């Protein structure tokens, strides 16, 4: 049964909506966060294995869309060589149909730029985007 297309998405949706109701939230999210993570894989890879030059990782990359509670809305896994601005397009394809109440996203600064993900989200989906800058680590305090 779990091998059928869309089964895990349906299970995840049912659990997520119940949790959101328990948290006194609307079952459908109104904002989300997108991020990616590159993960090392073992020695022999398949088609979905590649090298992420920015993070210096050989393996796979996952793009995640979560709600403001951190609950998974959608995930895509592909080769680590896929650039973030291309991965977000794959992740969010038809997301406006799946999540009609989701007009706003937070993205990290890696999605900034005319040809990058933030511009594509605004132009294609009509959603607003806030770019979140990486927090700088405070300088270590000198001890005398």
Locate the predicted segments by residue.
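Short alpha-helical elements
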Residues: 1-144
């Amino acid at each position: 049964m779990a091998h059928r297309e869309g089964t895990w998405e349906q299970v995840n949706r049912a659990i997520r909506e119940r949790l959101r109701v328990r948290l006194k939230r609307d079952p459908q999210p109104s904002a989300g966060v997108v991020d990616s993570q590159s993960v090392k894989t073992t020695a022999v890879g398949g088609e979905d294995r590649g090298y992420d030059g920015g993070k210096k990782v050989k393996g796979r990359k996952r793009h995640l869309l979560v709600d403001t509670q951190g609950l998974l809305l959608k995930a895509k896994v592909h080769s680590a060589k896929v650039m973030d601005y291309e991965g977000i397009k794959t992740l969010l394809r038809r997301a406006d149909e799946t999540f009609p109440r989701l007009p706003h996203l937070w993205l990290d600064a890696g999605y900034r730029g005319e040809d990058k993900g933030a511009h594509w989200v605004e132009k294609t989906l009509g959603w607003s985007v806030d770019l979140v800058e990486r927090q700088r680590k405070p300088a270590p305090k000198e001890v005398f």
